[in-house]
Amino acid sequence: MREPAFWHRPPSWQSHLLSPLSMLYGAVAARRMAQPGIKAGVPVICVGNYHVGGAGKTPTVLALTALLRGQGEQPVVLSRGYGGRLPGPVLVDPAAHGAADVGDEPLMMAAHVPVVVSRARADGVGLAKAHRASVILMDDGFQNPSITKDLALIVVDGGRGLGNARVFPAGPLRTPLPPQLARTDALMIIGRGEAGEAVASRVAAAGKPVFRAQLQPDAGVVASLAGRPLLAFAGIGDPQRFFRSLRASGLEIRAERPFPDHHPFTDGDIKALVDQATREQLALVTTEKDLVRLRGRGWDHPELAPMAFPVTLQFDDETAVRSLVARRLSAARAS
């Protein structure tokens, strides 16, 4: 899905026109969110966001995976597997599954941590525990009430914030903000920007801790791409954020090709990218998530195959994040 431009502008005639639908959608979503969920039997940390689209949940999940392992935990990620055909529950096997089976994000994460995909999230809990999960990390699912969360960590892109702060379809919010704030345990702002700080102020005013983090590119990949004119393409929630990160790393972006989030690349898409790269003598670069969806696709000219631009999340104050996680795990196990 490609987000409408008016979602990220001050309230417009489009958002006003869609307000009645938003009120209905928001009321139903808020009522569903208030339903009780099952107890997983192990602590559950949910990494979610207030709005549809990307905000940096996947790198946050991977950063928390490393933090939890440093505390002696055995995390297992639980994902709905958006874009995959398998309903699950199934343990993702990178050697046997493709993005069309389990979704691009679960497949990408499975290279680093055990990942269970289950369209009905509650059904995936047993499989996660069978693989010795001491903690379940939910990738998304904040608005899904089926599993009780012991820590709900909300991720917001500092540069984008919440757009026009209207509920879908008038804006990007999944439900009205007040019920979401009530269920938020902490906020993580990724990157810098006034839009993110506005969200941080509101969450802090509600008495919830606010953390900050930055996405750091792989230095080796940056060095290998330096000095090469690039054609950058991305099918993620916010392609422009990817393009900005490339430029912020000092790389020369000659052309950009944004695609909708989770875009299933066709042979025509690949041919168009290769033709442009050949014609303009550009190297292709994309995100790790997009490269996962392209895995197994043939390239007539292997030297033109795209290179991934991996990023990792670094907490500004890892000690504070670690302390919150430890307290929440302890409280969950004591209850």
From Swiss-Prot:
Protein name: Tetraacyldisaccharide 4'-kinase
InterPro entries named in the record: LpxK (IPR003758), P-loop_NTPase (IPR027417)
Native species: Bradyrhizobium sp. (strain ORS 278)
Pathway named in the protein's UniProt entry: Glycolipid biosynthesis; lipid IV(A) biosynthesis; lipid IV(A) from (3R)-3-hydroxytetradecanoyl-[acyl-carrier-protein] and UDP-N-acetyl-alpha-D-glucosamine: step 6/6
Catalytic activity: a lipid A disaccharide + ATP = a lipid IVA + ADP + H(+)
PANTHER family referenced in this protein's UniProt entry, alphabetically: TETRAACYLDISACCHARIDE 4'-KINASE, TETRAACYLDISACCHARIDE 4'-KINASE, MITOCHONDRIAL-RELATED
Superkingdom per UniProt: Bacteria
Function: Transfers the gamma-phosphate of ATP to the 4'-position of a tetraacyldisaccharide 1-phosphate intermediate (termed DS-1-P) to form tetraacyldisaccharide 1,4'-bis-phosphate (lipid IVA).
Protein keywords: ATP-binding, Kinase, Lipid A biosynthesis, Lipid biosynthesis, Lipid metabolism, Nucleotide-binding, Transferase
Amino acids binding ATP: H51, V52, G53, G54, A55, G56, K57, T58
GO BP terms, alphabetized: lipid A biosynthetic process; lipopolysaccharide core region biosynthetic process
Enzyme Commission no: 2.7.1.130
Family (UniProt): Belongs to the LpxK family.
Root EC class: transferase
Pfam family, one: LpxK
A single cellular component GO annotation: plasma membrane
Keyword Kinase: yes
GO molecular function terms noted in the UniProt entry: ATP binding; tetraacyldisaccharide 4'-kinase activity
